[in-house]
């Protein structure tokens, strides 16, 4: 698979929706994750990321403008033991609770499907990272309608064992802007993961469409120690 320029991918797409990037730093020492949200409506743009425990939660920036909290207020990132869960909806909790019960990432997501926001039927995208005893692997998932047919849910899971240093994968909800919004197609895209978390976060944020970008979360986890650094950027301040 050809490696794509992540910044160029974002600059050329005004509305990829929500996106997850997971991979390994070039020097092989860090497990990396990024999650961004975008919005076209006032309700969707009226959000920030706020720290909650070891993860984050979306919150309304201006509570008086919040018209519908369903599908937009949730915990995108949660940590359970040596696993970090990143998703674009409340399926974060589904995966967390599934792991508590002994289910795998894929098994936990069997109880969920795409969002009920027809005619878009926004895909549920999810990722999980496991850092244990100096080893690291990750998986990504997308649950989507069958070409906007809500009678069928298509389930895809991609697992990456012993990822290559400097490589990561990018999955997002929409191919591009549209009405209705077309769901992501194909495998997660191969992208480069640099060593510098701050620079990575800045490049991602600068590349997202100025009108539509809302918030960005980036985390680098030391594969040997499990310690992590986090960067959160909110357009609303």
Which role fits each region the language model picked out?
Residues 1-237:
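Conserved short alpha-helical segments that host acidic/polar catalytic motifs at enzyme active sites
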């Amino acid at each position: 698979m050809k490696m794509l320029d992540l910044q160029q991918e974002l600059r050329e797409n005004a509305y990829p929706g929500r996106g997850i990037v997971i991979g390994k730093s070039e020097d092989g020492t860090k497990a990396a994750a990024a999650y961004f949200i975008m919005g076209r409506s006032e309700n969707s743009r009226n959000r920030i990321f706020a720290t909650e425990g070891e993860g984050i939660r979306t919150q309304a920036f201006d509570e008086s403008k919040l018209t519908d909290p369903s599908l937009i207020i949730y915990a995108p990132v949660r940590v359970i033991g040596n696993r970090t869960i990143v998703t674009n909806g409340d399926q974060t909790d589904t995966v967390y609770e599934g792991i508590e019960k002994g289910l795998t990432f894929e098994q936990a997501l069997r109880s969920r499907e795409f969002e009920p926001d027809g005619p878009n039927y926004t895909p549920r995208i999810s990722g999980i990272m496991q850092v244990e005893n100096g080893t690291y692997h990750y998986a990504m998932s997308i649950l989507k309608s069958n070409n906007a047919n809500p009678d069928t849910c298509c389930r895809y899971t991609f697992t990456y064992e012993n990822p290559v240093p400097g490589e990561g994968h990018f999955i997002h909800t929409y191919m591009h802007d549209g009405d209705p919004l077309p769901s992501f197609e194909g495998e997660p895209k191969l992208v480069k993961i640099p060593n510098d978390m701050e620079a990575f976060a800045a490049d991602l944020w600068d590349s997202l469409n100025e009108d539509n970008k809302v918030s960005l979360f980036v985390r680098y986890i030391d594969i040997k120690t499990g310690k992590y650094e986090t960067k959160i950027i909110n357009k609303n301040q």
